[in-house]
């Protein structure tokens, strides 16, 4: 075996045999070691090319390894032949592979033995090899040593000191930099070698076309012990390298797959996003189209509903009730159906109550009394010209029509049935009664007479509510004359009117029906007693004229008479059904028929209208709550009504009112009546007025001229109105007989001073209305100083003097230019159509009062255009009053409006308005003031008057040297700006909060009709006291100036000469011109506390000034009403 190994080693180191192509050349002849070596080299070449060994070569190689036995057993010849055969097999190599496959099966037993022999050889080599390192390890060790040496040298060079010579230092630095460039050098060398190899090997690809087997990895030959440990280590390294490359390739592939999946995932997301982006506009477009379609459908539906509403509204205005009801059914509007059903129930209930009223007498007849002719329905049916329709009886044709008609059509038929029920007995009036001698009735007055006669025939009562100035008095006289002439109803009739208009009633009876016995029941108790003794015994009268006061005072006498007709002029006096007058007339007097005359049936609310209806028909309109709920219930929670619902409510209410209320307007019946134009003239305030206005709004008190003491005020709204009128209203003892100061201290007086001379020169006559009688006194002083001819009528004017005053003013070529009237006393029932200009000095919270005053001139008989001037202080509380008045006028224009159902307007809102006025203070005073030219344009009725007014203004400016027209701050007396700290000391036990929102007690005035039950118990002896007797003496100021009566002050100033700065002003001596002028100590405001419903918009809760102390005012009375409650 050792010989074999040595032979193999010798073969390895021996020079290789020449190989030509793929053929192994084995020499013949001698055999021996050279031949074996050549055989082994050929086999090695085949194995290196990864080619299978031919069986002969395999057998020869095996025989070489098995050596002696094989070779010795077979003999020398046999061995040479086998070697030659192996060499030939190797030479035939690839070409005769087929034959090798066939021979391999025969040599398989020897092959197994060869494999075993090679394994044993390898084990022996591994066992006997000494300690050594592989080539790769040696190379790595060498590299490590080399790198360590270089690193050591770098450290050594870096640590060398710099004190060496220059040459040595340079060499060390060069060596150091060279060593540091080692890595760069390796990289450059590697790159250059790679480039060189690529250029060399790949420059000519066509030359590299050879057997691809040569490109395979050359493994070192280690079979059969040929090779060394270095070859095996290299094989191990290559194997590990291939494994790591495979692992890297797998990782790279997995990474690529993950990247692919990731990209695919994000690609899917992006694709989904792109699809979503494409779908969103499409979806939005589809949604928009759908929404547009829905919106267009709703628009078309709303347009269709609006068209139907407009059509229904037009049909409702036209009065086509059947068509309207059919359209309501088609629209399926539940709100309208509910409203129709509720109001239909009201109309049916009223119709039944009316029928019951007609069947019975309104008031039980006293024993022994006889019915007047024509008073019963059965008797009236026999009168020629009467048409009787029983609501319970219907013709067969009507029954058939009702049978075929729908039940819903009764909603509107209820209104017709109510009208026909009330006026089922009709009597045509074609001519006026012959007893009327004063003139001819107008057509609309004949219609009014026929309407009142229809109520009489049907045993019902009513309200004649014609607009003021249309002759309600004449129509009433015509009714009495007709009843006397045609029905033989001689009375007696009771006519109740305000005291101011009693002379007018008496004059109208004398003028139009002198044959009717009329008594004016007024005067002192003795006079009235004489009238009763003379006329009541034999009943030598037909009509008794009296006023509200005597109805209560002479109750025990007047209630004994069985009155046939009760006629109440200015019937809105009964707008409170709980007042003493209404309760007394209903419960204590015996009355068969009732008739109310009023030009303003609705002043503030639906409650007032019900009160009037309740007075005339208490059995029908017996519940105020039900009356309001009938119209309020359908929309108790929804107060906003559209135009159609509001008009329907108005229409249905008209159906309720139409049978009992007749109202005509001037523009409807009097087409030739001159127009009435209202002009609002705004004026500024003087510095004095602004000072007082600011004091009232800031601390609720004003400074007086008596010892520089201020005074706490009550009823702030009234105090602010006084500030707007004139500052003299606060300083009672101030010397007002100064010609210039009385004008310059008030903006309204300054405007009046410019306006009155122009109106007088233009030939106009003026009615001037004010609510404050004390202001009328100041106006009197002004008119006397400037020598204007005037008259005055207020609550203190006696009844017998009022007729004379009216006659003197209305007579032809009367010398009187101006008539001073109080709004409350002079605005009712007076005929002053000879004047064509009305000046409202201060507006009332209730616009109807101003309307009544305006219509004193704008009435039948007026031939000139009527101009109404309303004076308003800019930025003050008067603008709020004007705005509220405009809102209230809408109630009368529509008779009823949605605001009447609105119960949210409470006292809190009114209190908030007062607080807003006080908070605003004087910030808006004096803004938006018209110029003189604008005022002239508003006041002039034509261009000629305008240029006349312009000329008069220029003359006045030149005469006054262009001085300021209003008082400036430096001209105001110093005591006006006195500090409030100088007020009187207040006891410690008095409360510190002063109630400022209270109102004064109602003072006694002649026209006043707000009397309670105490008048029924009053003794007649009280009447013996003069009416103008002085009242309880007020506490005087704590100053040297004593309280003096105005008449005494006039006497003291009778010979006073005006010593003003202007020397051109002549001497003036006051004269008492007007008739019936009372002393100056009368009430400063005849009715500054208004009726309950219109007291003031600012009423409704206490408003206190905490910075003030309570101080008993010597200027006003106590601030609580008769029930002890504070009121504003």
Curated annotation (Swiss-Prot):
Enumerate the SUPFAM superfamilies for this protein: P-loop containing nucleoside triphosphate hydrolases
The entry's localization annotation reads: Nucleus
Q: Where is the composition biased (Acidic residues)?
A: 1084-1093
- Signal peptide positions are none
- Which GO annotations describe the biological process of this protein? positive regulation of transcription by RNA polymerase II
| Region annotation Disordered: where it falls in the sequence | 91-110, 353-415, 1076-1097
Question: What name does this protein carry?
Answer: Probable ATP-dependent DNA helicase CHR719
Its source organism is Oryza sativa subsp. japonica (Rice)
């Amino acid at each position: 075996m050792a010989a074999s190994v040595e032979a193999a080693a010798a073969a390895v180191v021996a020079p290789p045999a020449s190989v030509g192509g793929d053929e192994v050349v084995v020499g013949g002849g001698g055999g021996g070691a050279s031949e074996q070596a050549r055989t082994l080299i050929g086999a090695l070449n085949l194995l290196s090319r990864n080619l299978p060994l031919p069986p002969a070569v395999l057998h020869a190689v095996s025989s070489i390894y098995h050596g002696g036995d094989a070779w010795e057993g077979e003999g020398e010849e046999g061995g040479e032949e086998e070697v030659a055969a192996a060499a030939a097999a190797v030479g035939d190599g690839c070409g005769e592979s087929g034959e090798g496959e066939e021979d391999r099966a025969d040599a398989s037993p020897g092959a197994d033995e060869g494999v075993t022999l090679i394994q044993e050889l390898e084990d022996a080599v591994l066992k006997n090899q000494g300690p050594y390192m592989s080539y790769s390890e040696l190379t790595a060790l060498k590299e490590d040593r080399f790198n360590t040496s270089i690193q050591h040298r770098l450290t050594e060079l870096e640590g060398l000191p710099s004190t060496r010579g220059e040459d040595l230092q340079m060499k060390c630095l060069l060596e150091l930099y060279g060593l540091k460039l080692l890595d760069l050098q390796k990289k450059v060398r590697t790159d250059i070698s790679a480039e060189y190899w690529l250029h060399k090997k790949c420059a000519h690809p066509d030359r590299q076309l050879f057997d691809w087997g040569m490109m395979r990895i050359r493994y070192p030959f280690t079979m059969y012990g040929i090779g060394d440990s270095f070859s095996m280590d290299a094989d191990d390294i290559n194997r590990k390298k291939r494994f790591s490359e495979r692992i890297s390739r797998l990782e790279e592939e997995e990474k690529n797959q993950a990247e692919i999946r990731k990209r695919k995932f994000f690609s899917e997301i992006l694709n989904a996003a792109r699809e979503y982006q494409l779908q969103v506009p499409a979806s939005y477009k589809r949604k928009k189209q759908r929404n547009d379609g829905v919106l267009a459908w709703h628009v078309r539906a709303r347009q269709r509903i609006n068209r139907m509403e407009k059509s229904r509204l037009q049909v409702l205005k036209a009065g086509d009730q059947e068509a309207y009801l059919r359209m309501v059914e088609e629209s399926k509007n539940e709100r309208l159906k509910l409203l129709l059903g509720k109001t239909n129930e009201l109309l049916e209930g009223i119709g039944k109550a009316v029928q019951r009223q007609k069947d019975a007498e309104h008031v039980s007849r006293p024993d022994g009394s006889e019915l007047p002719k024509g008073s019963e329905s059965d008797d009236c049916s026999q009168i020629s010209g009467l048409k009787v329709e029983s609501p319970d009886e219907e013709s067969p044709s009507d029954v058939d029509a009702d049978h075929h008609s729908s039940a819903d059509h009764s909603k509107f038929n209820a209104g017709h049935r109510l009208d026909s029920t009330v006026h089922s007995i009709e009597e045509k009036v074609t001519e006026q009664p012959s007893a009327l001698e004063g003139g001819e009735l107008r057509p609309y007055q004949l219609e009014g007479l026929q309407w009142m006669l229809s109520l009489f025939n049907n045993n019902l009562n009513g309200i004649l509510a014609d607009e003021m100035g249309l002759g309600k008095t004449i129509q009433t006289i015509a009714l009495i004359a007709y009843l006397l002439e045609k029905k033989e109803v001689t009375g007696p009739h009771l006519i109740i009117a305000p005291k101011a208009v009693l002379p007018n009633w008496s004059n109208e009876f004398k003028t139009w029906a002198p044959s009717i016995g009329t008594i004016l029941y007024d005067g002192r108790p003795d006079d009235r007693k004489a009238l009763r003794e003379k006329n009541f015994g034999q009943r030598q009268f037909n009509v008794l004229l009296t006023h509200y006061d005597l109805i209560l005072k002479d109750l025990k006498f007047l209630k004994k008479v069985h009155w046939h007709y009760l006629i109440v002029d200015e019937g809105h006096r009964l707008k409170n059904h709980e007042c003493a007058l209404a309760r007394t007339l209903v419960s204590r007097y015996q009355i068969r028929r009732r008739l109310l005359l009023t030009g303003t049936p609705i002043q503030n609310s639906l409650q007032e209208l019900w009160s009037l209806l309740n007075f005339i028909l208490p059995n029908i309109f017996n519940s105020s709550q039900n009356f309001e709920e009938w119209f309020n219930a359908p929309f108790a929670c929804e107060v906003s009504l559209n135009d159609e619902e509001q008009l329907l409510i108005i229409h249905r209410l008209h159906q309720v009112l139409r049978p009992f209320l007749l109202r005509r307007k001037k523009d409807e019946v009097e087409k030739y009546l001159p127009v009435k134009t209202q002009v609002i003239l705004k004026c500024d305030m003087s510095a004095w007025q602004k000072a007082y206005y600011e004091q009232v709004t800031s601390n609720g008190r004003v400074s007086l001229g008596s010892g520089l003491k201020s005074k706490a005020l009550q009823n702030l709204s009234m105090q602010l109105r006084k500030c707007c009128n004139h500052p003299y209203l606060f300083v009672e003892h101030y010397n007002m007989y100064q010609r210039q100061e009385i004008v310059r201290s008030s903006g309204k007086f300054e405007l009046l001073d410019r306006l009155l001379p122009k109106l007088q020169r233009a030939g106009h006559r003026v009615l001037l209305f004010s609510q404050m009688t004390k202001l009328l006194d100041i106006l009197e002083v002004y008119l006397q100083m400037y020598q204007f001819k005037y008259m005055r009528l207020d609550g203190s004017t006696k009844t017998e003097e009022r007729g004379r005053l009216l006659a003197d003013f209305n007579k032809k070529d009367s010398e009187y230019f101006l008539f001073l009237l109080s709004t409350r006393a002079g605005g009712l029932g007076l005929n002053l159509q000879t004047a064509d200009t009305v000046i409202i000095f201060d507006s009332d919270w209730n616009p109807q009062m101003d309307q009544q005053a305006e219509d004193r001139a704008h009435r039948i008989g007026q031939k000139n255009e009527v101009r109404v001037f309303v004076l308003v202080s800019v930025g003050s509380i008067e603008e709020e009053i004007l705005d509220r008045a405009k809102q209230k006028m809408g109630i009368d224009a529509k008779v009823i409006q949605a605001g009447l159902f609105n119960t949210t307007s409470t006292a809190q809102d009114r209190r908030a308005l007062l607080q807003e006025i006080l908070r605003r203070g004087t910030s808006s005073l004096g803004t938006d003031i018209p110029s003189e030219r604008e005022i002239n344009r508003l006041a002039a009725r034509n261009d000629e008057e305008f240029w006349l007014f312009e000329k008069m203004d220029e003359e006045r400016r030149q005469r006054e040297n262009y001085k300021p027209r209003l008082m400036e701050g430096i001209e105001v007396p110093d005591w006006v700006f006195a500090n409030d700290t100088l007020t009187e000391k207040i006891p410690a036990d008095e409360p510190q909060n002063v109630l400022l929102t209270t109102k004064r007690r109602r003072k006694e005035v002649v026209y006043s009709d707000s009397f309670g039950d105490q008048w029924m118990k009053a003794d007649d002896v009280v009447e013996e006291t003069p009416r103008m007797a002085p009242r309880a003496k007020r506490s005087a100021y704590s100053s040297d100036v004593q309280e003096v009566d105005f008449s005494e002050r006039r006497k003291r100033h009778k010979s006073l000469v005006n010593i003003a700065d202007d020397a051109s002003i002549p001497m003036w001596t006051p004269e008492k011109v007007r008739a019936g002028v009372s002393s100056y100590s009368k009430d400063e405001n005849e009715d500054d506390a208004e009726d309950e419903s219109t007291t003031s918009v600012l009423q409704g809760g206490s408003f206190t000034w905490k910075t003030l102390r309570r101080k008993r005012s010597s200027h006003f009375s106590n601030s609580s009403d008769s029930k002890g409650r504070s009121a504003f």
